[in-house]
Amino acid sequence: MPMSSFKRKIKAIQIKIASPEVIRSWSGGEVKKPETINYRTFKPERDGLFCERIFGPVKDYECACGKYKGKKYEGTVCERCGVRVESREARRKRMGHIELAAPAVHIWYLESIPSVLGTLLNMSTSDLENIIYYGSRRVIERVFIVTDPKDTPFSQGDVIYETEYRIYRKKWDFDVEQAFVVKNPKSPVLSDIDGEVTLKTEKSITGREITWIIVKNITRATHTVLPGMILVVKDGQEVEKGQDLTKEMTIDPVYAPFDGHVEIDELSNTITLKPLTTSKDQPVVFTVPYGAKILVSNGQKVKKGDQITTSTSLPSVKSSISGTVRFGSNLNIRALEDGNFEVLSTGEVYVEQVIEERKYPVFEGALVYVNNGDQVKKGDHLADRFLFEEEYLSATEYKIFESHYPTMFDVEERTENDRPIVVITDIDPEVSKETGLKVGDIVTENEYEAYLQIYPEKIVADAGAQAIKKLLQNLDLEALQAEIEAELKKLPSSSSKAIKLRRRLKMVKDFLKSGNKPEWMVLEVVPVIPPDLRPMIQIEGGRFATTDLNELYRRLINRNNRLKKLLELGAPEIILRNEKRMLQEAVDALIHNGSDSEGKRSRRAVLKDRNGRPLKSLTDLLKGKKGRFRRNLLGKRVDYSGRAVIVVGPNLKIHQCGIPKKMAMELFKPFVLAKLLGEGSSSKTMRKVKKAIIEKEMPEAWEVLEEVIKGSVVLLNRAPTLHRMSIQAFEPKLVEGNAIQLHPVVCPPFNADFDGDQMAVHVPLSAAAQAEARFLMLSRYNIISPAHGKPISLPTQDIIIGSYYLTTVGKEFDSLKEEDVKWKFSSPEEAMLAYHLGFIKLHTPILIKVVINGEEKRIKTTLGRVIFNGILPEDLRDYNRIFDKKQINALVYETFKRHGIDRAADLLDDIKDIGFHYATVSGLTLSLKDLKIPPERDEILRKTWEKVRIIEENYEKGFLTEEQRKSEIIRLWMSVTEEITKLTSKTLAEDPFNPIYMMVNSGARGNIDQVKQLAGIRGLMIKAYDPRSREIKSKIFKGQAIHEALTFDYPVDKNLREGVDILQFFISTYGARKGQVDTAMNTSFAGYLTRRLVDVAQSVTVSEPDCGTHEGIRAMDLIKEGTVVEKMNEFLFGRVLARDVLDPETKEVLKNPETGKEYTRNTMLTDDDANFLASYKKMVDVVRYEEIDITELSLPNMYAEIAEPVGEYEEGTELTWDVVKAAKNEGKYRIKVKVYPVVGTVYAEEEPLYDKKGERQLLVYQEVINEIVAKMLEENGIEKVPVRPDIIVRSPLTCESEYGVCAACYGMDLSNHKIVNVGEAVGIVAAQSIGEPGTQLTMRTFHVGGVMGASDIVSGLTTVEKTFEPYAFLREEKSGGKKEIRKYYGSEAILCEVDGFVKDIATDESGRTVIYIEDYAGNIHAYKVPKRAKVRVEKGQKVLRGETLTSGAIVWWKLLELESEKGVMTAMNLLKIIKNAYVQQGVSIHDKHFEIIFKQMLSMATIVDPGDSDYLPDQLVPLVDIKRFNREILEGNAKVEENRKWVIGKTLAKRIIAETEEGELVELAQKGDEVTEELLKKIIEAGIKEIDVFEKDKVVTYQILPKEPIKYKRRLLSLKKAALNYPGWLSAAAFEETAWVLTAAAIEGKVDPLIGLKENVIVGQLIPAGTGLDVFAGIQVEETPRAAVEEELA
């Protein structure tokens, strides 16, 4: 027999970082190709993204090639195609993987805030990004040129950048000059003058060539010199005019030196003497001097000593001008030993006088256009350029060119370049010491090359993900932990460096604890998710539509394969780098495609499709409303469901609904089939026959359906499902047609009406589900709202009007005397007979005998009232009352309280039947005549317009400002509108049967405000406005009523019955539209509010019957700014007492005289109890003198002091057992005492109690009287005071259950008025109760149509938002570690920090108002009032700690600091504000729901001093965890001595590293060492507080030094923050900031214990609430076939 059980299978879920091995182990094979499906065969490509070999077969139990088909081959791997034969479901589960050609960083760990990689490696995110994406660093630096390389590998002229130069300079000796970079040299080089060109070449200091082009403009004097002359000047020598160029000389004759022949050369003017052939002499040549004669002839033979020439004298040649000597090109000369020159033949010597000269240096590589000696004209081109753009010049070269071309080029002393950067991954320790570099330092590529040249093979640097991977692999986490801990000891705990270090330490510990390896954050392998989770679908036209993921995977595979190919080819590094960067970007895009969530643009390119739409990555699939969490895991679709339009079902019982036959057949098809099959055989043909019976709609099918439906229930749901009453169970009744029929009374909980609303039907399938639906969800048992404990399933509209019509009476009824009544009846039956026979009508006054409370009485009433009372329980009948909406609601509630839920449900059905019947009988219609306009209206309007005219005149004369004018007019019209409203109401009431009056008065539809607009006056209209406008802001600042700024001062003085004119119509449209827009804008906002509330509270369930606490909150009226927001009886209803309630006078437990109920601890308070306790007051003595007998065993049960000295105790000492002991020692048996009965009671008068002079308040309403106050009363001669008991009730706020709340602190389950059951999901109920009206708040504007005076919704919602997000409206600025509020709306409210009195309110020298408070001890406390704030107190007023002294917003953390541990005062202040917002809108919600939300908002604390925990200062930690940690520390500290003995002889499970006094890290012990006493002593001296040892193969941690507990401060969180800080990672991830939550959880290896509801829904098991509790897990529900049951019954 089938069983259904409630067992939950998953205990907890852990998340970790996947290692490459784990990813490969998940995979069914490597995806090598980017192809998906073959376009011809439509089969998946082998090794592609849809490969069957990797992911499983496309067809069930069939391999790709078709060799193996059918289930019998399951598990076989086809040898042809390699596909395993299995179910195609495998394609939803089996994963693949991609082996990356180069590592890629997981983007989540880089872009998280704070960056995980950055924190762990101690690097900034920008540096990390630069490394990973092969970025560069912009460097502005000087450049140097090598002038003398000496013994280095440099060459002369090498260019070195400053960064490299600094590195080289430390190790090598070489000379450099600073270089200048040439910019914008002007070209070509032009001659500035006419002249002659001279070219000259020379080498510069850097070994480069400079060509000098010299152009001279000259005057030239020619001087001829003759052979034999001696030149006394050199070429290029400067001479003056008249200076000798040659010597003046006499030349002797020439004689033959030996015998020989003469040869004369006339051309060269020389004589050669050749010796005789016999002689050994050599030939001699003589130049014939100018003017000498030759005495021999050519060929003549001469003897030694013969004269050959005559003597001659040569004059000197003088320079005709001053200038430079230039030898002519034809000049033939011979240098003499004395440095002069002998002229050998006639030639020219020039003297040049330079008029102008220009020099043009040209750098090597430039093209020179001229040659030596060329004549050039001014403007002629000499060279194409003198310098090249971007040329580097040494300082010397720069000077040369600067002097010759002063304005023709610019230079830069520093260059600006983007240098690729690398990170050091390995370095020799000596090199590290020498250079100061360490692993993880970032250097530019140039610097790295410089280091590499100096220290070859001793330093390694790299870029890209592989560099990050190496860094992470190099991390020694244990040593790093010891190093950080040692450094932290030296720093003040609040310093920013310490906080940064603690964050890093936490991460290190997380990695150590979770067993994750840091290098796993860099991917070697990328997992490929199953293909059915990223499907391709064929669309018309033969094309395929595919998921974005496939495109992202495709790009990744393409880039990966390209990189593999390039690596095989040995491509250059620059190409590889680019390809690796693109691969990294492809991996990024797959994981998280898009800019960072915080709005900061990432450096990554966003991958887009053809249409420019960013592709959806894995992160996008998880996060947001459409993500995996919220759409698929938390928002599953439900099978066995249908949906249809709803219509009213007037004949249904409250627990029934009408389901269309067709729909029922479809929903219950399996059950019908089972029943049909159960009777016959189950062969295939039979099955087909049965199916046909259903599909052909044969009568047998309907009969079986009727049977199947009998006794089962279905669930009806109407969207939006705002609270649990939006899903209720009903018994289905088959109906014709296509619409679901709904009982009219259950419309309010569903918020349904019949204007086209649709509802969904769900069938609970199992017996367990059916039982749960029937007993817990049946609409019959859900007529009481869990939000406020009053009925919610209530009659509306027609039913109300029917009941009202039935019980209403004519005008003359009350004045009619009994003796004048015409008709008298002995019983209701008799009266009915008379009615049916037409003698009387429903409203005819009659006298009739009826039974009231068991007695027969004769009363005056009407038949209608008799009929109506006939359906009521006997004790609730009232024959002289009109039953309108309020009365009926009260009636249903009272019936429920007295007779239970079933009777109340039956009553609702009866009221429905009677209401519909008599609404029909009433013949209710609407006509224009029913709208009675008050006759006085016109006169009132005439007078008002006259008053307006006077105001306008005063304004024009300048007596009023614009604001005053507007304000006066608005006030005037508001009072007139009010007056006309009253008149309209009065006019209508003249006829009790006026249909409009009946509708409004009965509460069936509409209100007097709408009637006023129809028949009275429309009044003032609201403007559309911008809340950010200056006008509004200034009003808020000044604390003025905003509504004046938002109101037209021109009224619509007509009503809708008469119609309005054009202008008034236009004004009306403004307000109407504003209403529509506000509603649209705020509905989504309210939905978001509900969602945050649910997220915060979803884990709060009732976890135990009683946590045992004696703490609680004080019962009181909630008063906000003088307005009572909630009366004490409402506050007390549904609560459990935390302490006994004592009678103020007798101090004994209080007893209710009517019921005899005693109000002891743990008593639950009903409505009646709450009313009794709230109204219980007594006048009690302030003080009494008594003499007590101290031999008795008890002290007085009130506060008492001794009235005479006893031993060392003075008079006025509190009476305690010590005092009694002292009295007994003195031999006394009786002592005089002063008893103060008022101490511990609560002052119960609303008017404060003043002192004798009437200047100072001694007691204020609801103040708890203590002994100090009692003595003040005594001093002021006050004898008796009206007081009530001090009532402390339990509350979720003070509950001490570790998880959730206990039943006693929660109190009554408002939906059934019994103590709440363990397992009830009270958190969700609270969130729904608060959120559901939020949407109501927004939707109410509809019906008022923007009329001024209708309280604006926005205000209500904004208040709610402000309360739940208390910091969203504050601008917090940190200064010196403390948060300061700089600006709030207006100003910050000042809180009183003591109990005391307002001594004075004065102004200081600067003109600021100061409030002086005197406390009970007489100390004065001064409070300066902010400029914009209003003072809320007056002189002599009593103020209590935590009260506000000025207007403005409460700064919650300041209030929290003022109060005790529990945060109750803060919660009560929040409660007042938020209750006020809801009460104004007429919404009732029980306080306990708010308290649960506040409990969650107060569930965290900020760490002040982390002590020996892993937390960081200012970190938010759940209070539960802190308390647990501190408790464990206290227990651990007590065991230290015992542990020290226990660990001796054990084996260490981890090595132990400590810091020496010199600051060095040393290893004290290795893993596996035995713990000796000596080693333990060393460990203790090193300050190590706990060690890990092996115990039976398990690692156990022992504490060996006392630890410090955590010091903390309670925090009030906003809803969003409370939800995000939820301890379970699954729920937090599903809320918001999914990626960050998962990242943090994975690093920690966080375990989600699945405590809350959301987590369990996500993992797909029963929630740990209600029937899902472990208590019920063992229950098995047997599914008994109905036939068997029927047999048994028969």
From Swiss-Prot:
Binding annotation for Zn(2+) 2 = 1107, 1295, 1302, 1305
Gene3D superfamilies documented for this protein: 1.10.132.30, 1.10.150.390, 1.10.1790.20, 1.10.40.90, 2.40.40.20, 2.40.50.100, RNA polymerase II, clamp domain, RNA polymerase Rpb1, domain 3
Domain of life per record:
Bacteria
Q: What keywords are annotated for this sequence in UniProt?
A: DNA-directed RNA polymerase, Magnesium, Metal-binding, Nucleotidyltransferase, Transcription, Transferase, Zinc
Q: Which residues bind Mg(2+)?
A: 753, 755, 757
Tell me which EC number(s) this protein carries. Answer: 2.7.7.6
A GO BP annotation = DNA-templated transcription
| Catalytic activity line of the entry | RNA(n) + a ribonucleoside 5'-triphosphate = RNA(n+1) + diphosphate
Residues involved in Zn(2+) 1 binding: 63, 65, 78, 81
The record's cofactor note says: Binds 1 Mg(2+) ion per subunit. Binds 2 Zn(2+) ions per subunit.
GO molecular function (one): DNA binding
- Cellular component, GO annotation: DNA-directed RNA polymerase complex
Disulfide bridges in this chain:
none
Pfam families in alphabetical order: RNA_pol_Rpb1_1, RNA_pol_Rpb1_2, RNA_pol_Rpb1_3, RNA_pol_Rpb1_4, RNA_pol_Rpb1_5
Which cofactors?
A: Mg(2+); Zn(2+)
* Subunit structure and binding partners: The RNAP catalytic core consists of 2 alpha, 1 beta, 1 beta' and 1 omega subunit. When a sigma factor is associated with the core the holoenzyme is formed, which can initiate transcription.
Q: Which PANTHER family match?
A: DNA-DIRECTED RNA POLYMERASE, DNA-DIRECTED RNA POLYMERASE SUBUNIT BETA
UniProt record similarity statement:
Belongs to the RNA polymerase beta' chain family.
According to its UniProt entry, the function of this protein is described as: DNA-dependent RNA polymerase catalyzes the transcription of DNA into RNA using the four ribonucleoside triphosphates as substrates.
What name does the UniProt record give this protein? DNA-directed RNA polymerase subunit beta'
